[in-house]
Amino acid sequence: MSFFGSSHFGLPRLKPLSSKRSHIVSVLDIGSTKVVCMIGRLTPRQESEILPGRTHKVEIIGIGHQRSRGVKSGVIADLDALEGVIRLSVDAAERMAGLTVDSLIVNVSAGRLASDIYTASIDLGGQEVEASDLRKVLVAASQQSMRQDRAILHSLPTGYSLDGERGIRDPLSMYGDLLGVDMHVVTVERTALKNLELCVNRAHLSVEGMVATPYASGLAALVDDEVELGCAAIDMGGGTTTISVFAEGRLIHTDAIGLGGHHVTTDLARGLSTRIEDAERLKVVHGSALLNGADERDMISIPPIGEDDRDQPSQVSRALVTRIVRARIEETLELIRDRIQKSGFSPIVGKRVVLTGGASQLTGLPETARRILARNVRIGRPMGVAGLPVAAKGPAFSTACGLMIYPQVADIEIHAAQGGMFSPFGNGSGRIARVGQWLKESF
């Protein structure tokens, strides 16, 4: 049954993770260049001092990935093609894990992700802050974001205030006249989610939860100090580049740009008159965002675009390939820089930027990013996830690993709905959870 059919606001919410037993979690990362299914075993552990919010050890017991088809710049363009790729990826993961998958946590890149901060306040009359007061102010803030054509993916309280004093993490039992909250809400077009759910359902699977791609990749690639002090995670995928900003242990901003590694490939194919497949190989083997002195002398063979035996490969300098690659990379990084500046969170990001995603592996990218962003830059890989094959330990698998981590941190979210409040933990079908239980777990 569709989770869009029963409630205007109802998106699937994950079941709570018991702190005393293990869980099997299945995730699906749908991207423009690849589709990844992972099956993991989550085992209770003491909370990590380095990795934020990790309450369980994650061990991957099954993984399957296929070259993506039917997705362009994060948007589903061919349901039949994508359905087939999903089936193959899930089947490979099931065979490796020795179990059957019924439902998955899925990432969301399309649908014009929007990130907004909503503020609400209520009068306390000098009384003590009670659980009911928290409920009222949280619902008031979250309800401001409700739109007929958009669905709430994430709603995270980023901070409270009492009588104008900001930066309060837990106001419960404190006294004041005015209680306020700042709520970060990530929304997405409902039609994009419907198409995503439809495609998963056609593969005879159900959607257990949905997570914004920038949130997932940040969860996998950032360490505790970065999440607390402020940092931007830039996920450079094949069709899109997403931005997530974390501070004080919370996701506080997301954004997306319709440029990625595949745009570099198409630039090479056009500029060098070669096939997409050959351009991709050129990018991986010879592509760089930095010129060096020998590039003008080094010659590279470019296969012709046709199949005529009389067509001979052309010879171009490595410098020409680098100039084509560098132009698109610089454009993307300049857009990222401008988006961070426009967001108003540039001071919070400070000097810390983490690059992740498959396109972040391009030679010379960190150095170019440091120059354009004027910040310290490192490449982020999935951390704290055991059992990954060597090929899946790189930045390209950060989103999939972040989806595996997400159930451990989902309890910080709240979702308002028709005068009540959604906990992120329901029965998987959008059932309204008890507010008291959420408040007990959160405070």
Swiss-Prot record:
**HAMAP family to which the protein is assigned, alphabetical:** FtsA
Family label: Belongs to the FtsA/MreB family.
Q: Which GO terms describe its cellular component?
A: cell division site; cytoplasmic side of plasma membrane
Keywords associated with the record: Cell cycle, Cell division, Cell inner membrane, Cell membrane, Membrane
- Protein species of origin: Agrobacterium fabrum (strain C58 / ATCC 33970)
How does this protein sit in the membrane? Peripheral membrane protein
Q: Which GO terms describe its biological process?
A: FtsZ-dependent cytokinesis
Where would you say this protein principally sits, based on its record? Answer: membrane
What CDD domains does the annotation carry? ASKHA_NBD_FtsA
Pfam family for this entry, one: FtsA
How is this protein named in the record? Answer: Cell division protein FtsA
InterPro entries, alphabetized: ATPase_NBD, Cell_div_FtsA, FtsA/MreB, SHS2_FtsA
- Where does this protein have coiled-coil stretches? none
Q: What is its subcellular localisation?
A: Cell inner membrane
The source's superkingdom equals Bacteria
The protein's job, in short, is: Cell division protein that is involved in the assembly of the Z ring. May serve as a membrane anchor for the Z ring.
Its assembly, as annotated, is: Self-interacts. Interacts with FtsZ.
